[in-house]
Amino acid sequence: LPTPAPDDEGAILVATADGKGVPLVRADAQQVPAFDKKERPGNRRMATLGCVYSVDRFVRTPEQIVSALFRDAAESQPEDRPEARFKHYRAFFADAGEDGCDAVPSAYSTWAWMAEEVAARHQSGQPIVRLMDGQLSLWDAAEACLSDFVETLLVADPTQLVVDILDIVHVSSYAWKAAKALYGHKEHQEAFVEDRLLRILRGEVLGVVKGMRRIATQQGLKGEKLKAVTTACNYFENNASRMR
């Protein structure tokens, strides 16, 4: 795809990636090693989909973000949400490698392409946002592929912003799992999730984690319920730097 004209780009440059299961036709499915098939139910092969786009700023309060997630019409939303510009997509499967070389994970192939896109489209002073879920391999690939370009930018301009953001939709899914483990009634679950998401969006993620662990201890959770809360707490803790 051609590189967009700088004057047509938005104020922020966003790079995002996610793993996707791709259904295989029979001929391709037969090429998947037998030992690998159990991890790909339904004859699916994992690919990493990457997208680079630009967008103008859209300022919202934590309350507005949470109300949008809950589809709460009582909370007014800003009008005229800016549209993403020049969404460039590309997806990669893992490269099996040749001549005894190790396989190249799909996340690295995707981020290598995305790094080229970012380098070609970035404008002086334009903030770069890396937006993903908490999958460690994606963040490792982003760091490996984009770090040299970012370091060059920071040498030229120490004020250059590179912001890592954890996708709030994935955050909310972990909060819901914890809520269902802690409370039996739906209204209590909703109140818990709404409160914790608000606090996370206000930068209080470590306080949220501490409180969730305390409640789990007070309730004496065990088994799958304790596992759900512990998994959510670990997810939030491991990604706290991306939820500031």
Predicted regions mapped to residue ranges:
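Catalytic center-proximal scaffold of phosphoryl-transfer enzymes
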Residues: 1-244
